[in-house]
């Protein structure tokens, strides 16, 4: 008979609070979120994947048909629904932080900013530019720099900032697990 592994000791201290991964596009939120959820015995949700599933089309097409404002409205609706659930690691879209009303939901959980830094982000995006609607311009680097400057102070509102480099997602997940206790109440000692 297979026994499931014991839950991570942090799971109880988290008290079911969702962990929201924020950061620029290509910062590794989805790839890090899966192993993080697995380590904590949490569920995993990618808001972009949920939006694509609900809309029945890929995000670039949603941007083309609905515009950024329409997409952001869908994103907020999805976040509202996710916020009703608990014990989730949530990979958010890069612009999730741009709507002030989203922060009310994000701050009900723990907000974790994955920050690879500008150069690494642009390198990753350059390799995947076709799937990034906000970079479909004459000068993608200038568009990126503008977005980066606009969003940086918003990401800085996160509860935890995690500098990431070339580590594998599993390693980044472990780094988050090592840093999370500084945000949590000490474990409760039970008598008896």
UniProtKB/Swiss-Prot annotation:
Residues annotated to bind Mg(2+): 30
Chief place of localization: cytoplasm
Cofactor: Mg(2+)
HAMAP family named in the record: Shikimate_kinase
Gene name of the encoded protein: aroK
Cellular component, GO, one term: cytosol
Cofactor descriptive note: Binds 1 Mg(2+) ion per subunit.
Primary role: Catalyzes the specific phosphorylation of the 3-hydroxyl group of shikimic acid using ATP as a cosubstrate.
Origin species: Prochlorococcus marinus (strain MIT 9303)
Name assigned to this protein: Shikimate kinase
């Amino acid at each position: 008979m297979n026994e499931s592994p014991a839950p991570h000791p942090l799971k109880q201290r988290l008290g079911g609070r969702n962990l929201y991964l924020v950061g620029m596009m290509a910062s590794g939120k989805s790839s890090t979120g899966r192993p993080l959820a697995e380590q904590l015995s949490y569920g995993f949700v990618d808001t972009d994947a949920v939006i694509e599933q609900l809309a029945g089309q890929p995000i670039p097409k949603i941007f083309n048909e609905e515009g950024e404002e329409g997409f952001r409205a869908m994103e907020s609706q999805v976040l509202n629904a996710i916020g009703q659930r608990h014990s989730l690691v949530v990979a958010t879209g890069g612009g999730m932080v741009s709507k002030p009303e989203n922060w009310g939901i994000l701050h009900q959980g723990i907000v974790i900013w994955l920050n690879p830094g500008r150069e690494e982000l642009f390198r990753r995006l350059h390799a995947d530019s076709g799937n990034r609607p906000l970079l479909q311009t004459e000068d993608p680097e200038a568009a990126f720099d503008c977005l980066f400057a606009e969003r940086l102070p918003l990401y800085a509102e996160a509860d935890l900032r995690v500098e990431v480099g070339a580590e594998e997602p599993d390693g980044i997940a472990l780094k988050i697990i090592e840093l999370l206790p500084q945000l949590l109440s000490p474990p409760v000692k039970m008598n008896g």
